[in-house]
Every structure is written in structure tokens, then in C-alpha cells.
Amino acid sequence: MKILISNDDGYQAPGIVALHDALKTLEGVTVQVVAPEHNNSAKSNALTLHSPLYVHQAASGFRYVNGTPADCVHIALTGLLGYRPDLVVSGINNGANMGDDTIYSGTVGAAMEGYLFGVPAIAFSQVDKGWGELEAAAAKAREIVAQLRAQNLVDPQAPWLLNVNIPNMPLTALRPIALCRLGRRHAAERVIVQQSPRGEAMYWIGGAGPAKDDAQGTDFYATAHGHVSITPLKVDLTDHDSLADWAQTAMRLAPGACI
């Protein structure tokens, strides 16, 4: 099995090193890393379209790109690797990607880029920042990949996208995997305004809001109770529940305009 690994924290981040070292020990597995040169957190699915991308190789063998997480996976799958991987894995991220985070996350964006190309993909994140219990998280990621492989679920003919969040706990303390839906966060914190040395106003995006929907069955609830959360994701953002209602509204606004 051939695995492509990327992330959004950069090719030198402890999370991607730990993930690579764990996955390469799986029997019959080859692992390649193509990751951003620098931290690209919150870049979502952004692609670089108006400037060239350059690929370099570090002494570790990791290849790094002056672009976004999605750039890395995109160019890897469209020519850089020279073959099609069986699995795309992103992470391990320094901090949670739960609920609304998945919209902004470069970690999820890298995995989603693989999924868009028809390759099964997983985004791995640790719940808390700081890399605490990172070896345990990498071991759990390895275990999940091994189990999916053993059950013949790593099938390029039937791609899927999974979002996995791992509490920062010893491996033996982690509770069983919980399959759950995404929760929701409150609105982000207020923008931070500072003054530059030249007297100009500088603006920093505020931190993510606390959990709003953390009810039982959500990723927030699962990880808060020591479980590893797994949420299947999809690309279709259509609100199917309200589609019929909006169709009726559109007919009233512009009769005959709906197809």
C-alpha cells in the first residue's frame, strides 16, 4: 500500500514526523511526504494559482512546497509522485479540527484534496495544542490505518474522507473510537487590534469560539470524554433539507426561473 502524507503545520512539524515514523512501520507500506514549507494553518482548500510552486527535498527525504496543503496534495497526485497512492493521510495537526474547524482547516483541506481526486483520505488532529502525548496519537493513527486496511476499506474504487480527532492522552487511557457528527462552535472571538511602529492599525483574527453544540453524539462530546472521534465528511454542501422550501420561494420571486 502506498501512502501520501501531508499536513498544514509544515514539513518539520513534530506531528507529521511522528505520523510518518508510525505509518512506515506497517508491513508492505511505502510512505511519501509532500508538505508545506511553512505553517499553513486555516488555509482550507486554497490552491496557489498566480505564482509558481517549487518543490525541494529535505535531508529526511520529505519533500516540501512553497504552497498550501491542498497545493501539496494536488501536485503530488497530478505528476510529482508519478503514481497514484492508495491513501492520503494528513496531520497530525497541532490542535483540534472539530465542528466548524473543518471548513477552515488546512489539515482537512489536504485530505479533501486527495478525496476530490478519488483517493481515500484521513485527516488526523490532536485535540490540544502543544504535542502532548504525540507518540500515543501517532500509534492510534497507525492502528486506525491498519484496521481500515485489514478490512479492505482502503479501496480507490470507493473513496471516503474521515476526520479524526485524538485526545492528548496515553494510549492505554484512550477510550474506544466514537463515530460521531460534527458539533458547532460559537462565533469566533473579536478581532485583535494593535498599532504598528508606524502608527497604522494592525488586525489579527481572533481565536475560535468555544463549543456551542457539544451534545452527546458530537465530536466535541466524544473527545471531551476521552474517545477518539471519527466523522465521515463529504464535499456536497447542498442543504438538502431546505432545497424544496427554497425552490418554492424562488418560484414566487421569479416564476418559471427554476429548472
From Swiss-Prot:
GO molecular function, one term: 3'-nucleotidase activity
Family matches, as Pfam families: SurE
EC number: 3.1.3.5
Location(s), subcellular: Cytoplasm
Cofactor(s) in the UniProt record: a divalent metal cation
Keywords carried by this UniProt record: Cytoplasm, Hydrolase, Metal-binding, Nucleotide-binding
GO cellular component: a single term: cytoplasm
Catalytic activity line of the entry: a ribonucleoside 5'-phosphate + H2O = a ribonucleoside + phosphate
Annotated coiled-coil segments of the chain: none
Residues where a divalent metal cation binds: 8-9, 41, 93
Note accompanying the cofactor annotation: Binds 1 divalent metal cation per subunit.
Family: Belongs to the SurE nucleotidase family.
Function, as annotated: Nucleotidase that shows phosphatase activity on nucleoside 5'-monophosphates.
Protein name listed in UniProt: 5'-nucleotidase SurE
Organism: Verminephrobacter eiseniae (strain EF01-2)
